[in-house]
A protein has these predicted regions:
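Short, polar/flexible loop-turn hinges at active-site or ligand-entry regions and domain interfaces
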Residues: 53-56, 98-101, 120-129
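Active-site SXXK
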Residues: 44-50
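Glycine-rich, mobile lid/loop segments that gate access to catalytic sites or pores
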Residues: 140, 148, 159
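M16 family metallopeptidases and their MPP-like homologs
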Residues: 15-17, 23-43, 60-116, 152-175, ...
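N- or domain-start disorder-to-order transition segments that initiate the globular core
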Residues: 1-24
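Residue-level detector of conserved catalytic or cofactor/ligand-binding positions
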Residues: 192-200
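Acidic/histidine-enriched alpha-helical segments
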Residues: 64, 120-144
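Active-site glycine-rich loop that binds ribose-phosphate moieties when present
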Residues: 182-189
Length: 200
């Protein structure tokens, strides 16, 4: 199979980078958006909430069991900053199909599970579960506060905030504590709808 990049929907790209020297398959699903002070905390919180459960696997225990059936597949969340863009999403990995017992296919069900997290997250009353949003919001705020404890990261962030105060580049990849504190399950769900409609 050759390396390729193809637009599968408007603003949605599939990039394939085959590498036979590895014994694992890796799948990355990323949302790339302009870094924006008002939306950065929402974007940073979104993958953490989506990774808490799907309608089929509504909690971490059920998700963990589903991953265990795929030989210990792992799915982690990512929140990165690349210039004036914010990249958030998931990275999943599993044993490459070539090494699975009995030739079992693992990549497709792993991709389906990531697809469920993105497209069929657990909801109640048309919104994300309040419990999940509040729990992950606390984690996000803790991560924002923890930057102060690392002198190098804190100095770098403050430098960018001062030098690039009026530019997207000055915004932290995690957003700010004040905005994060105001997020609710309703506002996060509405943000996700706007976020995905921008891509369409």
């Amino acid at each position: 199979m050759m390396e390729f990049r193809r637009e599968i929907m408007r603003h949605v790209y599939l990039t394939v980078l085959p590498a036979s020297k590895f014994k694992t398959s890796c799948l990355s699903a990323q949302f790339v958006t302009e870094l924006d002070r008002e939306r950065a905390a929402y974007n940073a919180l979104l993958p953490a909430v989506l990774s808490r459960g799907t309608m089929r696997c509504p909690d971490m225990e059920a998700l963990s069991a589903a991953m265990d059936t795929l030989y210990g597949t792992t799915v982690t969340t990512t929140v990165r900053k690349n210039g004036e863009r914010q990249c958030v999403g998931f990275v999943a990995s599993c044993i490459d199909d070539r090494f699975a017992l009995g030739g079992e296919k693992l990549l497709e069900p792993m991709a389906a599970l990531v697809g469920e997290m993105l497209l069929d997250p657990v909801t109640q009353g048309g919104h994300y579960l309040r419990e999940y949003v509040e729990s992950e919001k606390v984690n996000l705020i803790d991560s924002i506060r923890a930057i102060r404890n690392d002198k190098r990261d804190w100095a770098n962030l403050r430098l960018l905030q001062e030098m690039c105060a009026a530019e997207p580049y000055g915004v932290s990849r995690l957003g700010d504590e004040e905005t994060a504190g105001k997020i609710t399950n309703h506002t996060l769900f509405r943000h996700c709808l706007l976020y995905t409609s921008d891509a369409a």
